[in-house]
């Protein structure tokens, strides 16, 4: 990946969890990534979405923040697992009015952009 690309351009070219980890120079164990790649990327996305309003305008600072959040997302799955972390809505359970539990995900949430 060329260093002349803007952060946004570089992010568009990244495809896999390994691409992101390599680009941001986050050391990783391929065995951890192999099992948790989608969870790591979703957690990274979730962290960035929460941080977005507070990002500094300077791209170099943004790159550093992105790297920290990606490293944290990866570490979440080094020290835990996907069932414990419940990154995706299908793994999250909510209480039902009858006292039971449900992991139902409505279509409006599935197709939300």
UniProtKB/Swiss-Prot annotation:
Instruction: Please give the superkingdom of this protein's source.
Output: Bacteria
Q: What does this protein do?
A: May protect the nitrogenase Fe-Mo protein from oxidative damage.
Instruction: Please describe the quaternary structure of this protein.
Output: Homotrimer; associates with NifD.
What protein family does this chain belong to?
Belongs to the NifW family.
* Disulfide bridge partners, by residue number: none
Q: Name the species this protein comes from.
A: Dechloromonas aromatica (strain RCB)
Protein name (database record): Nitrogenase-stabilizing/protective protein NifW
Iron listed as a keyword: no
Q: Which UniProt keywords apply?
A: Nitrogen fixation
* Record-level GO BP terms: nitrogen fixation
Cross-referenced InterPro entries: NifW
């Amino acid at each position: 990946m060329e260093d002349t690309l803007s952060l946004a351009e570089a992010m568009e070219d990244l495809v896999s969890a390994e691409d992101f980890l390599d680009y941001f120079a986050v050391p990783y164990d391929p065995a951890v990534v192999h099992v948790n790649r989608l969870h790591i990327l979703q957690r990274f996305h979730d962290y960035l979405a929460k941080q977005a309003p507070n990002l500094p305008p300077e791209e170099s600072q943004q790159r550093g923040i992105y790297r920290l959040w990606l490293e944290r997302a990866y570490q979440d799955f080094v020290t835990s697992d996907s069932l414990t972390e419940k990154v995706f809505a299908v793994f999250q359970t909510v209480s039902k009015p009858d006292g039971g539990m449900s992991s139902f995900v409505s279509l409006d949430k599935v197709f939300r952009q």
